[in-house]
Curated annotation (Swiss-Prot):
Organism name: Trichodesmium erythraeum (strain IMS101)
Biological processes per GO annotation: base-excision repair
Molecular function GO labels: alkylbase DNA N-glycosylase activity; DNA binding
EC main group: hydrolase
Family designation: Belongs to the DNA glycosylase MPG family.
Protein name: Putative 3-methyladenine DNA glycosylase
CDD domains: AAG
PANTHER family: DNA-3-METHYLADENINE GLYCOSYLASE
TM regions (residue ranges): none
Residue pairs linked by disulfide bridges in the UniProt entry: none
Entry's EC annotation: 3.2.2.-
Record's keyword annotation contains Transmembrane helix: no
Keyword set, alphabetical order: DNA damage, DNA repair, Hydrolase
Signal peptide: none
Length: 201
């Protein structure tokens, strides 16, 4: 997977429902160390924004959700069920709680060192399903609360890159309702790459 233009904070200074579909096809780069860098394509996203009852900041600002308020271009990582981490990209202007949840990634290949993060199974799992879900991708890429509030910038533990021109030509995105929530279920704020095996559901 070739390197593309790094996404700057200014590109993210928009409401999450605008940014989320445009992140489909972009690259998430995870730098664990100088020798361990993994690149994967974002294939599924969800938006959470002000006025949305499913948004963590719907009622008020708290120590847990304060990262959601910006600035744009940082990561918001939270823990659910006491065991699964979820990675979000903070968007919009500073002070507005707006994020894009990264729901699934597509890996082109899996380096040998990455298999150590994959639970042992009777049969080798499909590469397309390794990051098919927010909890799965965080476990695979070693993303946890230590990365909450970290800057998404080249050379940092994580950053984002724009879609490649070739990917852009054949891009087909499906828009639908979000999953795994009980409020705001009518909002069409989930997007995923059509006909992609790496999508969570």
């Amino acid at each position: 997977m070739a390197n593309n233009e790094v996404i700057e904070n200014t590109w993210l200074e928009r409401p999450s429902p605008e940014v989320a579909p445009e992140l489909i096809g972009c690259t998430l780069v995870r730098r664990i160390s100088e020798e361990k860098i993994i690149r994967s394509t974002i294939v599924e996203t969800e938006a959470y924004a002000p006025g949305d009852p499913a948004c963590h900041a719907y009622r008020k600002r708290t120590p847990r959700n304060t990262v959601m308020f910006g600035p744009p271009g940082i990561s918001y990582v939270f823990l659910i069920y006491g065991m699964y981490h979820c990675l979000n990209v903070v968007t919009d202007i500073d002070g507005i709680p707006s994020v894009v949840l990264i729901r699934a990634l597509q890996l082109e290949s899996v380096p040998n060192w990455l298999w150590e993060h994959i639970p042992k199974q009777k049969s080798k799992p499909k590469v397309s399903r390794l990051a098919a879900g927010p909890g799965k991708l965080c476990r695979l890429l070693n993303i946890d609360l230590n990365l909450n509030g970290s800057r998404l910038r080249a050379g940092q533990p994580m950053w984002l890159e724009q879609r490649s021109p070739s990917f852009e030509k054949n891009l087909q995105i499906v828009q639908t309702t979000r999953i795994g929530i009980t409020k705001g279920t009518n909002l069409l704020w989930r997007w995923y790459l059509a006909n992609c095996d790496a999508v969570s559901k």
